[in-house]
């Protein structure tokens, strides 16, 4: 399983004792975690501004991810120009899932599959992982 992480997921995983960070740490044993320079740069800028003491840990975590090229190409979905590099990155990285918390820009696509990439929230992704037996409900 290949999972592309949006910038807001990378940022959220930077919080101390984050349940999301714990989930992603466990998930690394079952999946390839991906991002691209576009998401990485946005997340790092936000961590540096809002959680500067976590910047080193954030960089360490992101260094464990597979970095896919930032590419832009035409898509058959309605998406803001600023969000195209995220979905295009997930597609270019052959991700099975794009995990994002961006309800404003991706909300209309939640649960949909675009070019073999299913766009999900963290909660939706947890359901997928539970159904696949990768994690247990707790």
Regions found by a protein language model. Give the residues of each.
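Short, well-structured N-terminal submotif of metal-dependent ribonuclease cores
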Residues: 1-35
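Alpha-helix capping/helix-boundary segments
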Residues: 9-10, 39, 86, 104-105, ...
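Short, flexible loop segments at the rims of nucleotide/cofactor-binding pockets, characterized by
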Residues: 10-13, 73-79
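Acidic, PIN/NYN-like endoribonuclease modules and their adjacent C-terminal/linker elements
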Residues: 36, 104-138
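Acidic, metal-coordinating catalytic cores used for nucleic-acid/nucleotide bond scission
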Residues: 76-83, 103-106
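Acidic, metal-associated active-site segment
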Residues: 81-98
